[in-house]
C-alpha cells in the first residue's frame, strides 16, 4: 500500500485485493480525500448527500447547529434549529424526506425538505421509545410505502410505517419488532433488494430482509478476524447498487464488498490511517465513480473525496403486483402457527349477512362477519382445513354444512349452518383411518349427494359420501387414492366434477371427482418460477364468464391464478400488500385461501378473496385472515 500526504489532502491507493468481477479488476483503486467545510462554523455529527442533487448539496445533523442544508463548499443554505444526530433521506417527488434523531425530545423525527426553496415541513415524530435509539434508516417498499427502522441498545429494533407515496403520516404506526445485534449503531437499507444492513460493532455487518412481511433472518456480510477480514470494529455503512462500503473506525479502514447472488465478497480494503476515528460515511454514485463524505472523530474533521470503484449490480427480481386488503379478522386466540384455512358461507337471501369461517389449529372453528368481527368460537379441537356446501339434509332439517379436518382425532368434524341466522352448531363427527389427517374439501355433484375428500400427511386421499338420514352424520368410504408426497389443499369444481389437489413440494393436480371413476392425476401446474413450494391453499372462482383456480404460493408469499380448464393458462401472480390508509398489514406465509364470486355487496360486489396471514404485523399479534375484493384481483391481473 502506498500513501502520500499533500497539504490538507489525503491520497490513498490500494494496488491489490480487488475482485476480478469489478470494472477496476486490473487497475489500482484510488481514494482521494480532502478536508471539507474546514472553515465553516458548524460541527456535524452526521453528514449525507442530498439525494437527487448530483452531490452538490449535503445534509448535516449537528448537536449544536441543528439540521442543515449545505452547498458543495459547506455554506449553509437552510437550517432547522435543534439538536440532531443520525441521518437518512429519500427522494419524494420534488422534495426530500429526511429522518434524524432529535436529541432534545429523544425521538426519531421526519420532515420534508424543499431543496429548491430550502424550507422544511412540519416535523413528524415517532412516539417516545422505552429504549435509547442509537441509529435509524429509511426504507421504501415496492408499493411506495415508507418505513423507518430504529436501532436501539441491547439488541432492540423496530420498523415503523411513516408514509405512503410522497406523504408523511401524521401518526407513524409500529409495524414489527426486530431482534438486532447488541452494540448496533448504524443501519442502511437497499430498497431495490429489500435488504436491511446493520452493524454489530465487535462482530461485523449483517443483512436482514427489510420487507415488513418478511420472516426474521440474517446472514453475515463480513465479520471480524479470525472469521473474516475486518481488523477491529464494524461501523457505519453506505450502499450503492451491488456494493456495500463499510468503515472500521478503530482499524481506520474502508472496506468494499461486492454483492453476489448468494452473499458478499471483499472487493478491497483502503487504509484511513491518517484519520483519527472515521465514524460517518455517505456515498453518491456518479458517472465516473463514487463521491464520498467521511466524518472523522465525531465531526471534528470532515472529508470529501472520489473513489473509482463501480460495483456490478446484482439482478433484482421484478416485484409482483399487489392488491390491498380492505378488512381483516380479529386475531385468533392462540399464538404461533394457529390460524390456517378459511371458508365462505353465502347467506341465501341476504348476502351482507354472509360469514367467513376460519380454522384455529390450536382451538377449533371461528366464525366472522364481513367486517372481520368474530361472532362465534367452537372449541372442538385442532382443526386444520374447512369447506362449506349448501343444502344438506340433517334428518328432517335442510341446513348448509361445514366440514373440517380434526387433527386431535384424525376425523371429520361436521357443523350445521342455520340458513337464516348463519349460526353454526356441531353436527357430528366421522372417524377416518388416517394417522395424520391434513386437508379436507367438499364435492357436490348435480345429483345432490355430498362428498368429502380427506387427505393425510402420507399422501392418502379418502373420499366419503356424507349423509344424516336420522339426524346423525355418517360417512361411507367410497374411494381411495394417493399422491407420492404430502398434500393439503384441495378444492372441487362441482359443475365439471373435478377435484384439484395440491402436493406441497410438487405442484397442483386435477383428478376426476366422481367416486366410480379412476383417480388418474393430470398436472395443472408444477412448482417452479411462478408457483413456489409449499403449495398450500387452493380456491375455485366460478362465474358465468370465467372460472379460475387460485393457489397459495407460500414459498414467496404470493398467490397464483390460472384458468380452471385445460390448458390451465397462467393468468398471473400477485401479493396482498400493506394498506397504509386502512392500517391493515399485508399477508405472508399463507396456508389456506378461499374465494367466492357471489355478490356480497359494496366492495365485495364481484366477490371476495380470503387469505390466511401467517405473520400478523402493525401491530404484531396472533395470526388472522385478510379480506380482498376480487374486483381488485381482476384489475391487477387484467383478467378477462
Question: Where in this protein do the model-derived segments appear?
Answer:
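Sequence/structural signature of beta-propeller domains
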Residues: 26-640
